[in-house]
Design a protein with these regions (language model features):
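Bacterial N-terminal signal peptides that target proteins for export
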Residues: 2-14
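N-terminal secretory/targeting leader peptides
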Residues: 11, 15-17, 30-125, 149-360
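A gly/proline- and charged-residue-enriched helix-loop-helix capping module
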Residues: 122-145
Length: 360
């Protein structure tokens, strides 16, 4: 996809999103209670925060509510947070609402982790369909484990491998060659994938990955295509191995006590405004996935190209991925899940859509 096409697509979905946000609900009534929300977004240097999360809370919400609803919204980067702690802080009432990645907050609920098991789905439309089918399970788990109201689900560009192989002229590098490599991960399920290919998982927060790759703490890293570009991974790695392991299932949740304190008009106002924002998120993810791959490699790109060597998965890689998913990812997750109900719910939703099956 050419960069001009990407720009046109971006303008189109932004215009649709802005229009939807304008017409989704009428203006707030004079009786709506004035209040400010304490909000944490995702990473401050990435696209979702800069173009959607931040502008929604700091600009759109006040404008669309006639100044009744405002927010003190900051990215987790600005607050010095890693993302792993945000749901526990939300439960404590430190914040009113948080954006986050499901696998970052699945410590207390393997069922939440089930939304984004590594390697199960390799295309975004199917991934979204699966997450929608699983939404009610996520909503229940957020309420029961974290006293939180799930308000939105979205995703990031596909999670792929980025490795420093030392020589950019290398054009063939299969999953079978990852054995013995130290690979950055951010979730247990990605760690299961790494174990399946014979690598060593190294858990590193996103903001700390570039120095870790630079110093050899990790040989490779897993993240989204555009996040890797925006974080300048191309300065410290040589190759992008384009095996898709998921799309970093993400969410917006509000403290349940705070949500329940809102009157019906305010709750409905939020629902009406967040629905089109969620559509914007998914549309942006589709565009940014390709943009990230292009910019990390040889372009086209509207900024500096990363000059990584791109390696597409072979038929043998796809066979190996299937085996790793079945024998490591699903088996280990089912064991963490621990109950037949948990496994059955996944099989009836994401499993049914993906054609995969988990078993205790």
């Amino acid at each position: 996809m050419k960069i001009t096409t990407l720009k046109k697509a971006a303008v189109a979905f932004a215009a649709v999103g802005a229009l939807a946000l304008t017409v989704a609900a009428g203006p707030a009534s004079a009786e709506m209670k004035e209040q400010e929300f304490r909000v944490v977004g995702t990473w401050g240097f990435l696209d979702h925060w800069k173009e959607r999360e931040g502008p929604f809370w700091n600009e759109r919400l006040p404008k669309l509510s006639g100044g009744k609803l405002t927010a003190n919204a900051k990215s987790q980067t600005e607050l010095g947070l890693s993302g792993y702690e945000i749901m526990r802080l939300l439960k404590l009432g430190v914040f009113d609402a948080v954006h986050g990645v499901t696998t970052y907050v699945a410590q207390d609920s393997p069922a939440i982790e089930g939304a984004d098991l590594a390697g199960v789905i390799q295309d975004l439309p199917t991934y979204r369909k699966a997450n929608e089918a699983y939404r009610h399970i996520l909503a229940r788990e957020f309420e029961e484990k974290y006293d939180a109201k799930l308000l939105m689900i979205y995703a990031w560009p596909s999670q792929q491998l980025f490795c420093n192989l030392g020589d950019k002229s290398v054009t063939e590098y299969g999953l079978d060659k990852l054995a013995g490599k130290k690979i950055r991960t951010y979730s247990t399920t990605l760690g299961d994938f790494i174990a399946g290919v014979g690598g060593t998982a190294v858990t590193i927060a996103f903001a700390e990955v570039v120095p870790a790759l630079q110093k050899g703490v990790a040989d490779c890293g897993l993240t989204g295509t555009l996040p890797a570009y925006n974080a300048k991974w191309w300065q410290v790695v040589t190759h992008n191995i384009r095996i898709r392991l998921g799309y970093a299932s993400s969410f917006l949740a509000m403290n349940l006590k705070k949500w329940n304190s809102l009157d019906e008009e305010t709750q409905n106002f939020f629902k009406a405004q967040l629905a089109p924002l969620e559509e914007e998120m998914w549309a942006a993810t589709a565009i940014n996935d390709q943009r990230g791959m292009d910019c990390n490699a040889q372009g086209p790109c509207d900024t500096q190209v990363g000059n990584m060597t791109a390696i597409e998965p072979t038929a043998a890689d796809k066979v190996m991925l299937q085996s790793v998913v079945e024998n490591f990812v699903l088996k280990r997750w089912a064991k963490r899940c621990g109950t037949q109900k948990c496994v059955d719910e996944w099989n009836a939703t994401i499993g049914k859509i993906s054609g995969m099956k988990a078993a205790l």
